[in-house]
Amino acid sequence: MEIEKTNRMNALFEFYAALLTDKQMNYIELYYADDYSLAEIAEEFGVSRQAVYDNIKRTEKILEDYEMKLHMYSDYIVRSQIFDQILERYPKDDFLQEQIEILTSIDXRE
């Protein structure tokens, strides 16, 4: 499994998990976060490997569709880059650093 795809799916899952069904959440979390094989997930839920595979592929598409429409992950990346640039440019500005910490904590709650 590609590490970039795994990282992206884990990130999208963090942002959009609440919009998935319980089964979709379970399969994606086991497959991407816990590194279970299709066979292990199938055994855990008493279904075929093909059923697990189909569900995971559908859920990947759903997560990508949510990101295409809502842009929560890509916006988070842009905000993080901007915060890093500001902190790098103004390392001694305590007020600015406090404000960025507040904004970062808001991002972490969502």
Swiss-Prot record:
Top-level division of the source organism's lineage: Bacteria
Stored InterPro entries: RNA_pol_sigma_r3/r4-like, UPF0122, UPF0122_fam_protein, WH-like_DNA-bd_sf
General function of this protein: Might take part in the signal recognition particle (SRP) pathway. This is inferred from the conservation of its genetic proximity to ftsY/ffh. May be a regulatory protein.
Homology family: Belongs to the UPF0122 family.
Matches recorded under PANTHER family: UPF0122 PROTEIN CBO2450/CLC_2298, UPF0122 PROTEIN YLXM
Protein name in the entry: UPF0122 protein SPG_1182
